[in-house]
């Protein structure tokens, strides 16, 4: 009942380490086998390929497994392997059939504060992908690579990048490197997101109401009103007062819900966003890959912050206008119909608001 197959694949396992990549596939006592690969250059076993009844099965890898996007992908699909920044080198040379790279940091503030350091992170991402050497690649990117998303499709002419902040410019550079290295890769541009583990954006602020950070003058004002606020925030290295986790979240929420100032003060009610539910990301990517799509905009219709507030709370009493022009996102897709949508979007505006409302009302801390 047992069998063994040896396969030699020519491959340079890591920089300057030429050598055979040996796979021994075995099945001793059962109807399925787990393949392992051994590299003389590295000296340990790494996952290679699954065999069931003698038939090779697809092997896939998720990079960024501990992140917001990665966590939601793991909830929808069982990957053969998953890793993050601290253990990614263990996946070098594994050559998976598919690599979903969701490991690019989404810290916009840090990227714009230190553009060169952020670009170095993009270079590292490129090298990670090269060293993993997948047969097929999906890169999770962002709408932020566009200076103006209004009316922009996947096949729209390239925009001038001079107006792009470092966050968007550097991620656009990574897209270009990936296209150079992997011409058949699927690049997915995501707009504003929601799903399990959400920790930022307007939906998070609407749920928590409690500001994550306060300017010193605002902290002093609120701390004078409330001992709860005074003890709940600590001065951070960036000069802002940051939540320290010591106060009861429900008590803080009650205080800020009754206060003129809360987390909603940071959003212009007129701003329009496109909110995408990460629960559908895996199925949308699979449909796009099956259709051999190379660039995909996962875009829902633009909805204003005020419209979301009213849909979720049932009230129309929130009006907030900031000095700067409001955000206005309106990304379009040529592939909306492929994913069950129409008219350039994945769903209707009402469907989007209904889904956001369901998500917000089912949210548990």
PLM feature segments, named:
Residues 15, 89-135, 139-154:
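NAD(P)H-binding glycine-rich loop region in Rossmannoid oxidoreductase-like domains
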Residues 184-274, 280:
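NAD(P)-dependent short-chain dehydrogenase/reductase
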Residues 79-92:
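A short beta-strand-loop structural module common to alpha/beta enzyme folds
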Residues 115, 119, 156, 160-172, ...:
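Short-chain dehydrogenase/reductase
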Residues 60-77:
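N-terminal Rossmann NAD(P)H-binding glycine-rich loop of SDR-like oxidoreductase domains
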Residues 9, 19, 37-40:
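Short, low-complexity intrinsically disordered segments enriched in A/P/G/S/L with frequent Arg
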């Amino acid at each position: 009942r047992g069998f063994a197959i040896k396969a030699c694949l020519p491959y340079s396992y890591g920089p300057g380490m030429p050598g055979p990549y040996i796979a021994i596939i075995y099945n001793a006592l059962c109807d399925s086998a787990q393949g392992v690969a051994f590299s003389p250059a590295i000296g340990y076993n790494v996952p290679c390929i699954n065999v069931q009844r003698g038939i090779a099965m697809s092997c896939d890898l998720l990079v960024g497994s501990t992140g917001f996007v990665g966590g939601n992908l793991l909830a929808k699909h069982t990957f053969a392997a998953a890793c993050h920044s601290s253990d990614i080198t263990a996946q070098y040379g594994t050559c998976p059939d598919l690599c979903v790279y969701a490991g690019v940091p989404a810290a916009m503030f840090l990227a714009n504060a230190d553009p060169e350091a952020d670009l170095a992170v993009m270079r590292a991402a490129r090298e990670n992908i090269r060293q993993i050497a997948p047969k097929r690649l999906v890169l999770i990117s962002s709408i932020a690579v566009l200076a103006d998303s209004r009316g922009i499709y996947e096949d729209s002419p390239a925009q001038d990048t001079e107006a792009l902040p470092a966050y968007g410019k550097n991620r656009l550079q990574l897209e270009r490197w990936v296209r150079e290295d992997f011409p058949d890769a699927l690049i997915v541009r995501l707009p504003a997101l929601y799903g399990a583990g959400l920790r930022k954006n307007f939906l998070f602020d609407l749920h928590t109401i409690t500001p994550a950070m306060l300017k010193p003058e605002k902290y002093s004002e609120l701390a004078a009103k409330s001992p709860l606020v005074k003890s709940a925030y600590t001065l951070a290295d960036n000069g802002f007062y940051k939540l320290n986790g010591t106060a009861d979240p429900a008590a803080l929420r009650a205080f800020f819900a009754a206060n003129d100032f809360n987390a909603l003060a940071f959003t212009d009610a007129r701003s329009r966003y496109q909110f995408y539910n990460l629960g559908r990301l895996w199925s949308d990517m699979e449909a796009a890959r099956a259709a051999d799509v190379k660039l995909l905009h996962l875009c829902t219709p633009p909805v204003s912050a005020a419209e979301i507030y009213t849909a979720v709370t049932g009230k129309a009493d929130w009006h907030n206008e900031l000095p700067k022009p409001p955000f206005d996102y309106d990304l379009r897709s040529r592939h909306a119909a492929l994913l069950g949508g129409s008219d350039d979007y994945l769903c209707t505006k009402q469907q989007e608001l209904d889904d956001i409302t369901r998500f917000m009302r089912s949210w548990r801390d």
